[in-house]
């Protein structure tokens, strides 16, 4: 038996070697280029008003409560899509405009969506609209204190903000079937002072009987939240698919 063991061991070694040779070699997958900004690091949701600042009111219905409810719903939906989210407030407390924009500027690559509901001078005013901060038209505008380089650099940002507003507005109309009041350019503080694509949503008129009746239902507020989530996602998909161009600096001859 002792003389047979070396031969038996040699046989096992041979079989193992043959089996090893038949196995496929290590797989080296083709490197896939990482798309910059595959997902925004942060989607900042800004429920308007809060604390002593109730916003628009209709009886006991307060804008600050509606904005927080919609923001919490939108946050969950965005997280389910794989986005990281931040809320400028997650309870009934006052947050200054400066604090809100600071949170919006914290991440290097993010989106900012401020959520509001309208207060119309006419009871007949109704519908949904979305704002973005376009480039100031003249030297007396909001950005007049910026250098010329900074003003020119704000143009791509304004275009991205307009895209975000457009996608959110389209989703709002699609989801709620509300009157489409379109997208508009305004230098509202919270969106004009964020260094990333930003939009401000007006999800209906608290001063309109039809609008406020719908806003008191969880189903309708869920539709608004879904529209915000849809709009953010569609904007990001469109932005992700855009070709990235590398511009070479001109060399003096």
Model-found features: residue ranges?
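Catalytic-site microenvironment of enzymes
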Residues: 1-253
